[in-house]
Swiss-Prot record:
Binding-site residues, heme: 463
Name of the featured protein: Putative cytochrome P450 CYP13A6
Role, per record: Cytochromes P450 are a group of heme-thiolate monooxygenases. They oxidize a variety of structurally unrelated compounds, including steroids, fatty acids, and xenobiotics.
SUPFAM superfamilies in the record: Cytochrome P450 (SSF48264)
Gene: cyp-13A6
The organism of origin for this protein: Caenorhabditis elegans
Alphabetical keyword list: Heme, Iron, Metal-binding, Monooxygenase, Oxidoreductase
């Protein structure tokens, strides 16, 4: 009897797995298939063979629209600008969710949901409360912290230059971005660069956890089990959970300090970092734990946004700004360094602009808008190396049809950003060339608005921290290029080897920094 029941259960599971796996076959949509129950999940969480480059290869094989399964999830890959623009902007009300791995949690109900993961009215509230942190006024306030972190980096570079050492700038930039975000997001008074115990923990988020993605990708209900057991699991199992614990300590310490100040009659004053900003919007947890439904999200623009954040949401926002601000900015700087080192004539032109527009040792906020060619260099860098493809996803919240392609409710959409940014029909036959001049005088500005160029995403869910990232990049590059030139060495990987499952990362960017006064 037990054998019969077990056989029936296994047959039912197998039949269900085959039914899910055959979804795109039944739809008549091409794509790689994999195996029932797994689909292409293993291929899309491979660190050494980045999934973003697999999307590129599959697009060449199957065309600009194709699909596959990842465990029980269906994912459609697209690389046509018109369809990207339709999904990210014009039909945003049908695609306001993101593709999420099960381990992330429920975007509607999870207490520690963040602005990247959540959707609907809850996303709108978090977006509204977070936006002031990235206004020009706020960026001016944190500019000094960014500059000071850059000065620390220059001191470290100087020590290595004196020893005539090659430098892996990827590691240097990770120290820099973690130093910046630790000060402006976590309220640390010092950056602790090159001795920050948080660095390996944050690195592990992007380099590890493949086993968790695989297990929970095949069996989503286990995600909830892992989350509840997070306190008992080793730090290496799910690194992000341990960082939550560290942030919780920092937030609680700020709350305790505010309570002491209130007793003494000390006013909190202007917010100095993200924790202050979010605490100013905090209310008792009970007021919003019930959540809000997302029906008629198209009409939600007229709904009043309540300034409410729970303790858990504050922790979640600090975490996502830490993780996103650490990796993507460091990678952008790394790719720019690689491209400048391998294109010395472009580097010289950029240095001439920096010398002309930033004559003082300090890089002020108003200098940044004058660095037009630097802006072109960074745009071209992110065209050639679209590192944040993971964020260029959406989830269909309501069945719809675009250009004859049907999107069912619950389907995930992933943009093949590499193909989009390397399409010769869009960018011309010199598409593989590093050519910042293509961006001069607004020549490619229209491509930033029609779905052809999306390094920071597009539409209402475009990266909220984009301007902070750009400020960090410009200030540090200007600081370095005033003093040094990047030079390739025998240890420089040419072409650069690409790795990563969450972001597209160079394995290393080893260069020599040559003092300009030499």
């Amino acid at each position: 009897m037990i054998f019969v029941l077990l056989s029936a259960v296994l047959l039912g599971v197998f039949t269900y797995s085959v039914w899910i796996w055959s979804y795109f076959i039944r739809k008549g949509i091409k794509g790689p298939r994999g195996f029932p129950g797994i689909g292409m999940l293993i291929q899309t969480i491979d660190h050494e063979n980045p999934p973003f480059l697999k999307y590129r290869d599959w697009t060449k094989q199957y065309g600009p629209v194709y699909g596959f399964t990842e465990g029980p999830q269906q994912t459609m890959i697209i690389s046509e600008p018109e369809m990207v623009n339709e999904i990210f902007k014009k039909q945003f009300d049908n695609f306001y969710g993101r593709k999420l791995r099960p381990i992330i949690g429920d975007p509607e109900k999870d207490k520690r949901v963040n602005i990247f993961s959540t959707q609907g009215k809850r996303w709108k509230r978090l977006r509204t409360l977070s936006s002031p942190s990235f206004s020009n006024n706020s960026l001016r306030k944190v500019r000094n912290s960014v500059q000071e972190c850059g000065t620390e980096i220059l001191w470290n570079i100087e020590q290595k230059v004196r020893k005539n050492e090659d430098i892996d700038m990827l590691i240097v930039y990770q120290e820099y971005t973690l130093g910046v975000i630790s000060r402006i997001a976590l309220g640390q008074s010092e950056s602790n660069m090159f001795k920050n115990p948080l660095l390996p923990k944050v690195q592990a988020i992007f380099n590890g956890s493949w086993h968790v993605f695989l297990i929970t990708g095949i069996f989503p209900p286990l995600a909830g089990v892992f989350r509840k057991m997070s306190k008992m699991l080793p730090a290496s199992f799910i690194p992000a959970f341990k960082i939550f614990d560290l942030i919780e300590v920092a937030v609680q310490a700020r709350i305790d300090q505010r309570a002491k100040d209130e007793i003494k009659g000390v006013e909190p004053g202007e917010p100095q970092d993200f924790i202050d900003l979010f605490l100013d919007a905090r209310v008792p947890d009970v007021k919003i734990l019930s959540g809000e439904a997302n029906e008629d999200f198209a009409k939600s623009s007229v709904v009043k946004i309540n300034k409410e954040l729970t303790f858990d949401e504050i922790i979640a926002q600090c975490f996502v700004f830490l993780a996103a601000g650490f990796d993507t900015t460091a990678l952008s700087l790394s790719y720019a360094t690689y491209l400048l080192a391998t294109h010395p004539e472009i580097q010289t032109k950029l240095q001439e602009e920096v010398d002309r527009e930033c004559p003082d040792p300090e890089i002020f906020f108003d200098h940044l808008s004058k660095l037009k060619y630097l802006e072109c260099v960074m745009k071209e860098t992110l065209r050639l190396y679209p590192l944040g493809t993971t964020a260029n996803t959406r989830k269909c919240m309501r069945e719809t049809t675009i250009n004859g392609v049907n999107f069912d409710e619950g389907m995930n959409i992933q943009v093949d950003t590499w193909t989009l940014h390397h399409n010769p029909r869009i960018w011309g036959e010199d598409v593989e060339d590093f050519k910042p001049e293509r961006w001069e005088n607004g020549a490619c500005e229209h491509l930033e608005h029609n779905g052809s160029y999306i390094p920071f995403g597009s539409g209402p869910r475009q990266c909220i921290g984009m301007r902070l990232a750009q400020m960090e990049q410009k200030i540090l590059l200007a600081q370095i290029l005033k003093e040094y030139s990047f030079r390739t060495t025998k240890n420089t990987q040419i072409p650069v080897k690409l790795v990563g499952k969450l972001t597209l990362s160079p394995e290393s960017v080893i260069v020599k920094l040559e003092p300009r006064d030499s």
